[in-house]
Every structure is written in structure tokens, then in C-alpha cells.
Amino acid sequence: MTGNELRQAYLNFFESKGHLKQESYSLVPDNDPSLLLIGAGMAPLKPFFTGKLVPPCTRITTSQKSIRTGDIENVGRTARHHTFFEMLGNFSFGDYFKKEAIHWAWEFLTEVIKLDKEKLYVTVYPDDQEAYDTWHNEIGLPESHISRLEDNFWEIGEGPCGPDSEIFYDLGPERGCDDPNCAPGCDCDRFLEIWNLVFTQFNRTAEGTYEPLAKKNIDTGAGLERLASVLQNKESNFETDLIFPIIEATAKKAGVTYHTDASTDISLKVIADHIRAIVALIADGVLPSNEGRGYVLRRILRRAVRHGRLLGIQGPFLVPLVDIVVDILGGAITNIVEKQDFVKRVVANEEERFNQTLASGLDMLSQLLDTLKADGATTVPGQDVFKLYDTYGFPWELTEEIAHEAGFTIDQAGFESAMNEQRTRAREAREDVDAKVATPDITHLSNEHISDDESATASTVLLIGEGAKAIDRAEDGQDVTIIVKTTPFHAEGGGQLGDTGFIVGPLGKVEVHTAKKLPEGTTYHVGTVVEGSISVNDEVTFAVDVERRQHMARNHTATHLLHAALRSVLGTHVNQAGSLVTPDYLRFDFTHFSPVTAEELQTITNMVNEQILRASTLEVETMSIDAAKAQGAMALFGEKYGSEVRVVSVPEFSIELCGGSHVENTGFIGQFRITSEGGIGSGVRRIEAVTGKAALALAQQEEQTVKSVAALVKAKPQEVVGKVQQVLDHAKAVERELEQVKKELNSGNLDGVLAGQFTVGDVTAVVASVPVSDMGELRDMADMVRDKIGSGVVLLGAAGGDKVNFVCMATKDVVGKGIHCGNIVKAAAQAAGGNGGGRPDMAQAGGKDPAAMDQALAAGKETIQSMVG
């Protein structure tokens, strides 16, 4: 049975038992900030287990793609460790329980995939007599095949927990130890765990007591790759048809053979495992970066590249492996087929970036380890680890792995200290425009009905805060945070800035600089008392800056139109990576791996303006998040959403989850103009644009610029491009003539320069100062002198303003006699207050003291003499 057939058999079996069969959830957790990535079958179903959300069915079955990197160093070194794997699972939310879970597991293993009953063993929790009796009395498993283990209890702190029962397959005594009592739970490889059945029946309280749950749940997990290895009679998961084709392709590329060398096998397995993780992560929207999920991806990808180098692969090699992963898994994980081309572009880009620095980084690390070894050291200093990370892109874990292979440990504390220093410098170097405003405790307002209503004209002050302290009254000049019972101010969110305006009380006025939301959703106002005073329980009125909000509404709706246009023109791989909506302009960050061409930008602009000209009425609805996703609504990556969401759509063009301000009709936007496009990171581009009055002002400014240029070149506006091109062509021709004149003048100076040539032993040398204006001319002059003498070394200096430049060139034959241009210019430059260096045959440097030219050239001459003499 193939791995794909096994997956389908499992899902079909549990579907026949009344389970809703669902495709794997994304590796990126949906609205769960406690998880970086999905690492188990039950993880995306957690809201159903906790009761936060109602499941679509009380029985669900999945084959959940999962990522775990906690023991990444073991991948390739054992038969079972992976960063990426699939977890087969069947789940019950207050429906069936222990007996059914055990019976169905046994039925699937023995009747569907027909495993040998004699080779199946189980473990149960010592106090779980019900599970023991079910296995022994109902299934008929002999007592010798059932073990009671204290470890068979699943819990993570407070909350739902319960005993579990693990199912093992006996791989045979030849895979085990010599202990005659060997059984499941032994550290040897004989008994392979293939399935874990968790019976969630208790709630652990804060006091550590266990209370029975009113609704008991079932959570099971069976590793697809493990089960496949048993069915296909393979010694490791890597040799199953789910992974081995990748190993074969990599071995062919590297010119090596699997199972002939242990270290070679490790690298082949690492690459095969990691490329599966890479494909799945990128297809789910994760891009390489230095933080969070992106760092996990970058670390995995660069580790794979490094193991390619260990196999002798020098160039890029990962992209063709993407196709193999898609061929194997695409039938079950459909989004990797849809995103296949995009995944390959991301992999190619990241692999190329790392390859540019990998060789240099490995050389530096090798030299560092040699030096440390010679000094008798056993720890790599944290500063050096940080330099490898900062300069060569080495994740510290990669440096740690290489160092460990050479017998060294890593100064992790020193590395983290250097990282923190860099973060501090970066933080201090930029203005923290997103700084959080300290807010007082609002738990005492829990019984108040606090709401947002853009039509509200009056309300009551519930709380005034000064920093983290609640106060009863604020006077003129005080900076405050204010919470009112009902507010018309729109809070920051989804990239849109908060509203500004005034809160007016009976005795004073507060200028509102922005509105923000607390984590639980309450809107608070950040402002300054500008007249009189404001007090708790004051009845207040509002004056929102409506014109400013309208400008933001234009830009926010235009952002939605831009997003849809980008996906239409560039491809569905485009996803929002960030946005900023201000009254003056909009900024949109999106995933794409090449500059957007001028033609594409024009097409995108035209598409957005076409929607504006259509004057479509926006549709705004509130619905369940599942209904919104079913309609194709796009969600902002990383944004938290409740069970009910607001959906904003432009009919037949755009549909997104959004809580921001929008125009009622696209025609109100006026017009849309893109002002800039550029890259801001690996695979992320940024577009800035303007709408409405700002777009009109830009058009008028550009029109006036064209008219001004037309007047300068004495042409009509429509003739400006051709006329300016004529001027540029003429200027280039004049520039070429000037260059030729300079070369002729320099050539005329050759005789004077050559007059100062001398010999040291059998090496001809020329050391001289020449009257040229820049480094380019100096190099040209040195070229001519070297060509003229045929064999030898040339050192030329040129003073200009408050600096001096040096160039040294040597023919190959004299380099073989000991001449090194890098050391020659270094000596000259240091004599003139500078520094520099370079290759043995060519080098350049600079100095700060033109008056020291003679001493500098003399120092260079002495260096030449010492090299030959």
C-alpha cells in the first residue's frame, strides 16, 4: 500500500464511521497567538475542544500536516525524526468515547490495512481499568501484549486532560535489545509507536485536582510516515514512497549512493525532510525572514543548502526537488499544487541569496575553529557566532551544528547579548511611531456596556487615565486616555489610523490624537485636555474630523481594489503582508519576488481606476467567519478575528474581512495613482499610492513639470520626450569627446611617469604621482603604464582636494616573484593617514593627507624593495 493510499484509506474508514472528512488545516495557526506553527493533529481543532467554537460536526477526521523543529538536530540521524510530517487523526467532541475509539483503531489496523495482530501491543494508564478491559476483554488482546505505564496520561498544565493508550508494532527481536523483558516503553527500537489514543475526560483545576468533564472528547494521532514504513516493510520513514524519491533525486544530483556512507545518508535524509517542510510552509504563506515563522523556514532551508554542500553540490539544487514533493503530496495537499510556481521562486531566491555568502561564511568559520583549536579553546565566542549570523546569514543553530561536529560548544549567551545590542541600536535609531500608550486597569468596567457607533453624538465618560493610573479629573494641558460608554471614533486597526477630533464636556475640551483598542476590544481615546477640565461621569459630545476620515475611507477602499488588482495581474500568490491607511496616502506590502514592471503597474492602475469609474456600491455584511471564508473573503495574515466578522466587498471584484472605514461607492475615490513600488525584504514588495485630492494634486504637479521642461527645451509638451532625448544624446557625445581628450593628455604624461622607473633585482618598478582627478582615471593611467613596461609593478598616487588615492598593479610574472599590490598600497596609504589593500596583482587605497604624498610613495617604494630584495 502506498503512502497516499494509506492516507485515503484512513480518512475513508473514519468517514464511514460518521466523521466529517476535512482537508489539512494550514500550518499557520488560525487566530491562535499561543502557537507559532501547527505541530499536531489536534492543534487547529483546539477551539472545538475548549468550547470556544462549535465544530461543524461532532466527529472529524483529518490528515494534518505538522511542523516540529525542537529536535531538528536529530533529523537524518534517526529513523523517525522529521521537521515535517502528517498526523492522521480521528476526533470526537462530546460524541463517542473510549470504547469506540479503541474498537475502531483495532478494526482499521487489522481489517483495513491488515497488520498482523500478533505484532500489535498497547500501553494504558495504570488507573485506566476501562481501557485495559476494553483491550483485553473486548478486543481479545492477551495480557502479555498490554503494559501499564505511568507516562500514559496527557496533560499540559491546567485544563482538559486524560489518560491515553498507545499502540505499538513489534519490529522483531533483531531490532531490539537483549533484555528478555523488553516491551513497549523500552528505549530500544523494537517496538514502534504507531498510534496514540487520548481520552480527554478530566479537567485539571488550578489546585491540581481532577474533575470529570461533562462532555468527554477523543483526540487520536497516527503518524502517516510511521504507518507507511510498517506497511512497506522499510527500516525507516525515509525509505517509504512518501520520501525516498526525494533522496534518490538528491543522490543523483550529488553523484552519491544511498546506504554506502553514514554521513552521506544523514545529509540525504536532512534534505529530503527539509524540502517537504519548505514546500508546505511557503504554500501556507510563510516567507523567509529573521523572525517568527519566517525564521523557522529560513533556518530549515539554509540547513538543507548546507547539507547539499556536504554532499559536494556546489550550485542551486532545491528547486527541482519542489516538483517531486508536489508530485508525491499534491493529491492530498492541494494548495502546494496551486502555489507550486510561487514556491519554486521563493526557494530559488532564498537559495541564491544564501549561496552568495555560504562559501565565505564556511571559510570564516573553518578558520575560526582552527584558531580556537590551536589556542586550546572549546567554545566559540558569541560575538563570532553573531558575526556569522549578521554578515553571512548563518542561523546560530547552523553554526552550533557545525561547531558541534568539530567538538566545540557555542557561547549562546554571548550571541544573544550581541543580538540584543543590535536590537537596541535599531530601536533607538528609529522613531517608535507605534509605541503603545499606557492604559489603566479597566476590570471595574466589566459590567458596563461599552460600544462603538459612528453615528453617536453624545455619551458618558467612564474612565480617565494618566499613564497607567486612573484619575477622576484632568486639567488643561494633561495628556490622557479616555473611555466613554459609546464612541463614534474609529480605532486603529487593519493598517488604518485612528480617528482624530474633539471630546467636548460641560467644563472643557479634549483634543483626540488617535483612537486605539485594548486587547479585549474596548476603544480608548488618546488625547490632551486643551480647554478647562474633563471628569469621570461627564456627559460629553463629539466632533470627529469627518473630512480626515473620508480621506482615509477613500484610501482604505482603494487598498482593497489594489489588492484584488495585484492578484489579478501578478497571480494568486500575492498576499497582503502589511498595510498603512492614512488621510494622505496608502501603503500596501505584498508577497511577490520580482519588481513590478512599468507595464504591470500601468495595468494595475488602470484596473483600479476602472472600478472607480464603474461607481460600484460597496456591500458590507456581518457573518460567521466560516461563511465569509466560504464566499472567498480574504483575511489579513496574522490578524485576529472573532466568530462574527465584517465583510466588505466590491461586487464581482473584491471581498475581504475588514473592520475599517470605507466609501459607500467606489466613485467617491475619485482617482488612484501609484507613486512608488519597491522591495522591502525577501519576497515582499511595497506600493504607495494616493487617491482623491492628493491624486489630483499629483497629476497637476506632473503636468506643470512637463510644461516647465517643455519651455526649457523649447518644445511642445507632447514633444518633450523626444527633445529631452536629443539633449541627452548630445551630452553623452560631448562627454565621450572629453574622455578621449583626457586619455590623450594622460598618454602624453606617460613619458614623464616612465622616466622614474627603476629596477629591484630583475623586477621593473614605476612609482610616481600623476595629475588626474579621480580613481577611475588613476586606474586607467596605471593600466597604460603597466602595458607600456610589459613586466613589472606600478604604484601611482593622485592628490585631489583633501584626499589622496593610490593604485598598484603588477604583471603575473612579478607576482610570482613576491610582489603583492595589496600590501604595497596599504603601506602607501597608511603613510598618508589612510588604509586599504587588495589582491596581489591589483589594489587601491585612499589617504587623508595630500601633503604626505612624497612620504607615501617612498613607503610604497620601500615595500617593493623589501619584497624583491
Where does each model-flagged region fall?
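A glycine- and charged-residue-rich anion-binding loop/surface
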Residues: 1-869
